[in-house]
């Protein structure tokens, strides 16, 4: 009865009490606006009520750490042209952290119409964090949060600092004091947690309306700066600065030297076209000198995968300046067979080739000086809709006057002594010296398609410039190429930062192929770090790389103990699956998810995190050509392909593969050139908090290992905190949704690190 009376009294005297939430702190309230604040591991919804309890803004941070908070305006009437500023942070002794170390961003909202999963909900969610560069408006009765991030300089003195945030609008002003305590330790420039976030440069080019590579390089540099500020690394900082390779001694391009299906000798030349939206062809790599006054005949042996399959042999003509002569294609469409047979094309110097009163081919034009030879396994068309596989052997281009074959290497045999690979690192080195010479990035991805299958019909096997694994030619090229990369990285001090990530989420059926590729890499360049993402981590595949990266939900701590103990690195990744209640990366999820990922990583001894993309803003196959998705209006990540018909879209989840927003809010109509950086998301800012939490934990470990005899009380306290209990998480489905639990432990770690630092002086 007394409880009922108490609740009734509170509702009468304090009607807002019923709706007051249990996070955040009221700063001040008047008829114009309520001001309240919250730490930055909360998503403040538009209609969240102001908290009942009061509290001043107090934050703590190490040197070289970023720490944030949110101030929320909840107007009693609409406010316009609100300006916001912050003063320098000052100690009573006069030490100062200048205001330029504070980023002020507006928390904006995106409308989730399609929830990411069955346990997600539609609604307006906070996510984009654009810088406040001009006054803004605040709607009556709607929360309008402002996000502050303070970067503490490495040279700052420890102790308490004080600053004032000022909001101004016509007829209204509010001053908000802020207290910052700088702890007496410094975070390292390079985070202990490695990371790999994909970044699509072509997407940036499109959405920023950039005209050339120089503009793209300028904008990418701003993205990379933002990455460093967030303590994350892109997978490839050298997207526009590739390692270039040139293979020498190979005379045919586009097909495969097939050792398993031959007419004579060691090889035939297989050309395979498996695509319905592009044409495939084999081509002699050089132009052949011809005399249009002489008769020629092309003769070859061929077979096709299917009986009566049509294939084509074409000859193009060029001037003495090696310019293509249009409308002068020569050649023949042939009917193939599953057994070898001989075909030919005759090119008369005078008379055209006529069939049923139709001119099929005319003599070489009088200005022709060169010709090229093209082998198609089907009949090429404008859309590339045909498919097929054909083999060619003993191909000859004969000058009938002299009887000489003017096409070298038409037998498709290879002199292995001629093979070589030239590597050009000049562009890569420019980027590496820019982005690896300064702290911030923890590593970079190397993709090697030479370990993947090529345009080859047959067994699933690695392919390098026309040669398949198992041939002496492949072995030689692979040895030169991979060892060349290894040695160059080692010579420049970059070895160990790379991870060779060439295959993604292999299925069990692919394990033999994956093992072969990893063995090639280890045999040719044993110092390179091999990497794999694993949807089903297990003993069948875990031993073939130096780093394994399962999806977080599939990580098995018990299974992985032995491999980690042996020194194998373990990372984890988040993606479109699984949805809530698992830890996930979606906009329509609890804010704590991104931070919890790092706490779980520490508990499980994981040393890296990966997300497939950070700016997947559009899937071209899901919309009409030239129409771009506007993620400011629809934050769902769509994906084409996956066995869906053209124009259909798989829904990956809101914000999957998308942690940054383009500055262009109307990509289909706004053609302004944006030479600016990205708009970060609230989720990536919270992830940075987790990365810094992880730094705290590793630094505590280091202090524990190097503790002095008189520091055992500190050691015991540190070990207790680092033994993460079930009040934080049980597994990736059972974890606290209350950020205050993480912040409590962070507070304890910060104080301990300060004490260790003080006693080690």
Question: What does each model-found stretch correspond to?
Answer:
Residues 1-7:
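Bacterial N-terminal signal peptides that target proteins for export
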Residues 7-16:
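Bacterial N-terminal signal peptides
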Residues 21-144, 156-157, 170-172, 179, ...:
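Extracellular and organelle-lumenal recognition/adhesion modules and their flexible linkers in secreted
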Residues 63, 144, 157-159, 219, ...:
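Short, glycine/acidic-rich beta->alpha junctions
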Residues 110, 130-132, 142, 151, ...:
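Aromatic-lined carbohydrate-binding surfaces of glycoside hydrolases
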Residues 234-238, 407-408, 607-614:
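Acidic/polar loop patches that form or flank catalytic/metal-binding clefts of enzymes
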Residues 262, 282, 287, 291-292, ...:
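Catalytic domains of carbohydrate-active enzymes that cleave complex glycans
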Residues 544-644:
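Catalytic-core region of carbohydrate-active enzymes that cleave or remodel glycosidic bonds
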């Amino acid at each position: 009865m007394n409880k009922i009376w108490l609740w009734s009294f509170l509702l009468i005297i304090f009607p807002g009490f019923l709706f007051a939430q249990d996070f955040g702190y009221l700063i001040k309230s008047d008829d114009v606006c309520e001001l309240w604040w919250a730490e930055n591991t909360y998503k403040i919804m538009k209609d969240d009520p102001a908290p009942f309890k009061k509290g001043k803004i107090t934050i703590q941070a190490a040197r070289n750490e970023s720490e944030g908070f949110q101030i929320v305006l909840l107007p009693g009437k609409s406010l316009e042209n609100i300006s916001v500023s912050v003063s320098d942070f000052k100690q009573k002794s006069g030490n100062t952290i200048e205001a330029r170390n504070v980023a002020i961003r507006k928390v904006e909202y995106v409308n989730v119409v399609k929830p990411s999963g069955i346990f997600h909900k539609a609604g307006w969610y906070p996510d984009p964090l654009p810088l406040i560069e001009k006054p803004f408006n605040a709607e009556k009765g709607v929360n309008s949060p402002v996000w502050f991030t303070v970067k503490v300089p490495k040279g700052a003195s420890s102790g308490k600092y004080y600053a004032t945030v000022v909001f101004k609008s016509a007829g209204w002003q509010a001053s908000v004091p802020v207290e910052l305590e700088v702890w007496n330790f410094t975070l390292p420039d390079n985070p202990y947690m490695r990371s790999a976030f994909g970044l699509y440069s072509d997407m940036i080019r499109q959405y920023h309306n950039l005209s050339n590579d120089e503009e793209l390089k300028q904008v990418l540099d701003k993205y990379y700066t933002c990455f460093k500020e967030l303590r994350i690394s892109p997978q490839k900082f050298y997207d526009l600065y590739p390692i270039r390779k040139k293979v020498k001694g190979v005379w045919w391009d586009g097909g495969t030297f097939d050792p398993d299906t031959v007419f004579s000798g060691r090889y035939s030349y297989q050309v395979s076209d498996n695509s319905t939206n592009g044409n495939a062809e084999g081509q002699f790599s050089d132009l052949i000198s011809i005399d249009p006054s002489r008769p020629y005949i092309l003769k070859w042996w061929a077979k096709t995968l299917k009986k009566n399959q049509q294939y084509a042999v074409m000859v193009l003509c060029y001037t003495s300046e090696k310019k293509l002569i249009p409308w002068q294609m020569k050649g023949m469409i042939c009917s193939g067979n599953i057994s070898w047979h001989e075909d030919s094309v005759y090119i008369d110097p005078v008379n055209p080739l006529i069939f049923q009163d139709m001119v099929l081919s005319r003599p070489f034009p009088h200005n022709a000086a060169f010709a090229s030879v093209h082998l198609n396994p089907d009949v090429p068309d404008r859309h590339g809709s045909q498919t097929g596989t054909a083999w060619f052997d003993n191909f000859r281009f004969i000058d009938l006057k002299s009887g000489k074959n003017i096409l070298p290497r038409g037998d498709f045999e290879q002199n292995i002594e001629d093979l070589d690979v030239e590597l050009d690192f000049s562009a890569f080195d420019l980027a590496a010296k820019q982005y690896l010479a300064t702290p911030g990035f923890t590593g970079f991805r190397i993709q090697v398609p030479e370990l993947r299958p090529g345009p080859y019909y047959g067994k699933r096997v690695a392919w390098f410039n026309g040669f398949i694994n198992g041939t002496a030619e492949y072995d030689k090229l692979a040895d030169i190429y991979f060892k060349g990369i290894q040695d160059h990285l080692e010579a420049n001090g970059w070895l160990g930062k790379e991870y060779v990530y060439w295959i993604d989420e292999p299925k069990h059926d692919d394990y033999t192929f994956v093992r072969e590729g990893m063995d090639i890499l280890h045999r040719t360049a044993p110092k390179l770090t091999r990497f794999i993402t694993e949807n089903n981590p297990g003993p069948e595949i875990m031993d073939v790389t130096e780093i394994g990266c399962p999806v977080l939900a599939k990580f098995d701590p018990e299974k992985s103990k032995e491999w980690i103990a042996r020194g194998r690195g373990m990372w984890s990744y988040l993606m479109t699956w699984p949805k809530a209640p698992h830890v996930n990366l979606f906009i329509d999820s609890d804010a704590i998810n991104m931070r919890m990922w790092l706490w779980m990583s520490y508990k499980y001894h994981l040393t890296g995190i990966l997300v497939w993309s950070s700016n997947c803003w559009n899937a071209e196959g899901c919309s009409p050509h030239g129409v771009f998705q506007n993620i400011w209006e629809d934050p769902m990540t769509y994906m084409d392909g996956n066995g869906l018909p053209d124009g259909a879209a798989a829904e990956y989840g809101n914000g999957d593969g998308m942690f940054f927003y383009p500055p262009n809010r109307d990509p289909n109509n706004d053609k302004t050139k944006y030479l600016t950086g990205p708009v970060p998301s609230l989720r990536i800012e919270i992830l940075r908090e987790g990365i810094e939490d992880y730094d705290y934990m590793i630094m505590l470990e280091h202090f524990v290992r190097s503790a002095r005899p008189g520091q055992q009380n500190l050691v015991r306290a540190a070990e207790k905190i680092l033994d993460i209990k079930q009040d934080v998480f049980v597994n990736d489905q059972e974890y606290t949704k209350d950020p205050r639990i993480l912040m409590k432990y962070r507070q304890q770690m910060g104080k301990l690190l300060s004490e260790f630092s003080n006693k080690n002086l």
